[in-house]
Amino acid sequence: MAVEFPRTMIENLSVSRLVMGTNWWLGYSHTSGAKDREIRRTCTAERVAEMIQVYLDAGVDTMLGPLPLAHLKEAIEIAQDKTGKKVLYLVTPSLNIAGDAKADDESRRAIDECAKMGAPVCMPHTSSTDALVDRRARVIRDMDKFCRMIREAGMIPGLSTHMPEAPVYADETGLDVGTYVQIYNAVGFLMQIEVDWVHRMIWQCKKPVITIKPLAVNKVMPLVGLAFNWSTIRDQDMVCVGTTTPDEVREIIEISLSLLERRTPEVQLQRTRSKASVEPKKK
């Protein structure tokens, strides 16, 4: 693909607006145990590396995920070696939020591990971040401490959150973060409040937003889900999507580019006998 995917900035870091999701590569399907097991069986390091390579060749170099498991680490290294391009890994570690000195030391070690792997952005995972959101006081308790640890480790702090309140409270309190995650899709899958409320919240955010689960775990077709997200976020915001095959990656990239460029996507549609009546008549 000749066209490089559009980019945005997280503080002084240039990132692709399309972000590689990792749930489907790590066995998190949000569907069933059987689906999780199938993902783990099929998403080998070699297969994931093929997908990452397609992304990198199209200028999509940004990835969102936890401290990577061995097979994902290997996949990233394979793809980087083949393309000569570097993956920007936005890492979402789980922290110990107990609040005592021992817990803080454990969190600092986790953050240092993120820095050691070369992650430019560190976003405490929703399991840590959202447990600290205080709706009564409209603050994210202790997050300023974790943000300081992240800055001291040389990374940009962010928030991986499923709560729409988190970006709001971060902005209201002047929390030192460069970006935040938010679940956002046309059908409201896993969203805690209505889609229109989250849409307005995103547009009011002071920092760029990484929208996740745009296809609602395949509950909407790629064209539908991507059209909704790309057309209702700002130019500085991002869309993070999961894939399971290199061809899916190519389709996601082409559909996204076509939507941003306002043209018809050049992808081969799935075919069944019922489509024959709407096909162009052969001359």
Regions found by a protein language model. Give the residues of each.
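Active-site beta->alpha loop and helix N-cap motifs at the rims of alpha/beta catalytic domains
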Residues: 41-137
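N-terminal amphipathic alpha-helix/helix-capping segment at the start of soluble metabolic enzymes
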Residues: 1-34
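Hydrophobic faces of well-ordered beta-strands that scaffold small-molecule active sites
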Residues: 15-22, 62-65, 87-93, 122-124, ...
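Structured C-terminal cap/extension of enzyme domains
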Residues: 8-17, 36, 47-64, 80, ...
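Active-site-adjacent beta->alpha loops and helix N-cap segments on the catalytic face
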Residues: 68-84, 101-107, 129-146, 164-169, ...
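Active-site beta-loop-alpha junctions enriched in small/polar residues
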Residues: 23-25, 68, 92-98, 127-129, ...
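Short glycine-enriched, charge-decorated loop/helix-capping segments at active-site entrances
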Residues: 33-42
